[in-house]
């Protein structure tokens, strides 16, 4: 049985997206936008592999022979931002090291991350199923986009959470083909932060301070199959049905641990604010919720 057949609501496969999914970004209401931020520069171009990263690739070839080539490149090219439990920057390391459970446990490696929750003008939430080639949590269903700000000038800006917003805009394009004009950085509303740890398998896992960003926009989608297997807009009730299937042990309906933490602790009350146009009232960026 296919994954899509398990749900009572429509799904959209990468190579057959329905035209109705896309609409002009002009329909977004300004009531959801936080105060305007200063214009920003485009994210810095990706650089070539460092000597350290190249050496790491060479040394781990035998251990990670089955890793997808794109994911392998990102594992060593991307430098995550290391933080302490108060979200203070303490350094940086490769995405590879930051997701090795051995490193996480031995060195308490903790990195900064973000999770985007994008709603359309009907207040439906866009979900994605992670691609089968993802190193951590392949083929699980999760929120719109989950990734990391990188250790680069434009994504280290602390003021107004601008660095994380810049990273979110970058990854929405990388994963879902959403152009920057459809998701202006000043329309992301940071609602909170949570600290969690979640092993994916015996080798890989997550240990993150995760920024939770909400945005209401109608966008055009062109998902990247290296990152995303499937996408789907869901209503609140449809999401509840999805959670029930996951709780029943349906192997084809697995949810990412960070998404489940947000669903269980925050999402439904925040969804109320989305529908009322009062989303900024829900923001609490002083607290780091340890879950």
UniProtKB/Swiss-Prot annotation:
It is an enzyme of class 5 (isomerase). Keywords: Acetylation, Chlorophyll biosynthesis, Chloroplast, Cytoplasm, Isomerase, Isoprene biosynthesis, Magnesium, Metal-binding, Photosynthesis, Plastid, Transit peptide. InterPro entries: IsopentenylPP_isomerase_typ1 (IPR011876), NUDIX_hydrolase-like_dom_sf (IPR015797), NUDIX_hydrolase_dom (IPR000086). Binds 1 Mg(2+) ion per subunit. GO terms for molecular function: isopentenyl-diphosphate delta-isomerase activity; metal ion binding. Gene3D superfamilies: Nucleoside Triphosphate Pyrophosphohydrolase. Its EC number is 5.3.3.2. Mg(2+) binds at residues 99, 111, 206, 208. This is Isopentenyl-diphosphate Delta-isomerase I, chloroplastic. It comes from Arabidopsis thaliana.
